[in-house]
């Protein structure tokens, strides 16, 4: 593969084939391409607009080069991040609820543009985010929950970290996280930062051997199920891709004021989650339940979103004990108790 020829092709706004993209991604991730060319390629891809084949090729490369673990029938709630609204980390809270009934391999990283990525909030709750593969299998067996820290499970990505930081713009790597779970999770609720990317990412997911993925983008521009209005969805399964629109009132509840969901830090997010689990923050609790409802539908545990919401109401009642179990087996209960104390007021 001639990198300069690839660059010329991208500058001419020609899309790469899947195999070309996969080979290119492997070379970049392994550190075989000079940084100045990596920068040029990432910018050219962004300016052209990443194609489905390019995303699939890059995702396959990242999956192949990742540290892998086997977690049958797992679900992930990782999204793209980057919506910039700074809401409470609902995907992590939903993952904890889901682990009451199904294996959860939560893939995630530190915050992209929000105040609290999944790694940040789990650390604030006392969780040890560096979990080696053998330990990960043990935790899944004992608790149905493990966090797979992207920086640990994709070690070769350090070869592009400097370029990405220097560029300071979104690149193709920002949208690959949800498609590259090291446990090869077959089920997923995937928040998407832009409505315009739903179609592209759903078509990419269809090529990547998932059983069922629900991609969501909600009003007012949030990479979650909308707390205030419509959620635009793509449901990806072996049968194809279905487009769905769903309103928060279809759950039988009123809209949730977005300002009640904003956080200032990872600790603030952790406190809001614990308060919701304790029944002390109804707004955040509702936000967690509506997102969990859609994840339950992705798992085929319920027949529709309304039934998923009713199931989520039951799960959140058992969430505090589950959180204690998760932290006690892989974390610092003292930190969790500190959050609990701050949440009790």
Swiss-Prot record:
Keyword Cell membrane found: no
Binding site for 5-phospho-alpha-D-ribose 1-diphosphate: 79, 82-83, 87, 89-92, 106-114, 118
GO molecular function, one term: magnesium ion binding
Protein residues bound to anthranilate 1: 79, 109
GO-annotated cellular components: cytosol
Positions contributing to Mg(2+) 2 binding: 223-224
Stored SUPFAM superfamilies: Nucleoside phosphorylase/phosphoribosyltransferase catalytic domain, Nucleoside phosphorylase/phosphoribosyltransferase N-terminal domain
Binding site for Mg(2+) 1: 91, 224
UniProt: anthranilate 2 binding residues: 164
Keyword Glycosyltransferase part of the UniProt annotation: yes
Segments forming a coiled coil: none
Pathway: Amino-acid biosynthesis; L-tryptophan biosynthesis; L-tryptophan from chorismate: step 2/5
HAMAP family referenced in this protein's UniProt entry, alphabetically: TrpD (MF_00211)
Protein role: Catalyzes the transfer of the phosphoribosyl group of 5-phosphorylribose-1-pyrophosphate (PRPP) to anthranilate to yield N-(5'-phosphoribosyl)-anthranilate (PRA).
This protein's name: Anthranilate phosphoribosyltransferase
Species for this entry: Saccharolobus islandicus (strain L.S.2.15 / Lassen #1)
Lineage of the organism: Archaea, Thermoproteota, Thermoprotei, Sulfolobales, Sulfolobaceae
Chain's gene name: trpD
């Amino acid at each position: 593969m001639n990198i300069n020829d690839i660059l010329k092709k991208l500058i001419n706004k020609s899309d790469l084939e899947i195999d070309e993209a996969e080979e290119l991604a492997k070379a970049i991730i392994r550190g075989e391409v000079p940084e100045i060319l990596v920068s040029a390629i990432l910018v050219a891809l962004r300016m052209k607009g990443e194609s489905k084949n390019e995303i699939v090729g890059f995702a396959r490369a990242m999956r192949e080069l990742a540290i892998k673990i086997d977690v049958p029938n797992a679900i992930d709630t990782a999204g793209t991040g980057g919506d910039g609204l700074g809401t409470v980390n609902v995907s992590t809270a939903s993952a904890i609820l889901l682990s009451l009934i199904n294996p959860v391999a939560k893939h995630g990283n530190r915050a992209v543009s929000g105040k609290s990525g999944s790694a940040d909030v789990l650390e604030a709750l006392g969780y040890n985010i560096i979990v080696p593969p053998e330990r990960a299998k043990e935790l899944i067996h004992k608790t149905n929950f493990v966090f797979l820290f992207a920086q640990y499970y994709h070690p070769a990505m350090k070869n592009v970290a400097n370029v990405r930081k220097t560029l300071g713009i979104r690149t193709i790597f920002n949208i690959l996280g949800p498609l590259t779970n090291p446990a090869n999770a077959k089920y997923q609720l995937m928040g998407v930062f832009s409505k315009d990317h739903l179609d592209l990412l759903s078509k990419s997911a269809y090529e990547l051997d998932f059983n069922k993925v629900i991609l969501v983008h909600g009003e007012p521009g949030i990479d979650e199920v909308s707390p205030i209005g419509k959620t635009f969805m793509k449901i990806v399964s072996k049968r194809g891709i279905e487009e769905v629109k769903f309103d928060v009132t279809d759950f039988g509840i009123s809209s949730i004021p977005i300002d009640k969901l904003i956080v200032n830090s990872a600790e603030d997010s952790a406190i809001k989650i614990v308060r919701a689990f304790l029944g002390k923050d109804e707004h955040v609790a509702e936000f967690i339940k509506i997102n969990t409802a859609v994840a339950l539908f992705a798992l085929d545990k319920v027949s529709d979103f309304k039934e998923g919401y009713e199931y989520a109401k039951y799960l959140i009642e058992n969430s505090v004990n589950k959180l204690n179990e998760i932290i006690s087996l892989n974390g610092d209960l003292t930190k969790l108790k500190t959050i609990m104390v701050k949440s009790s007021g």
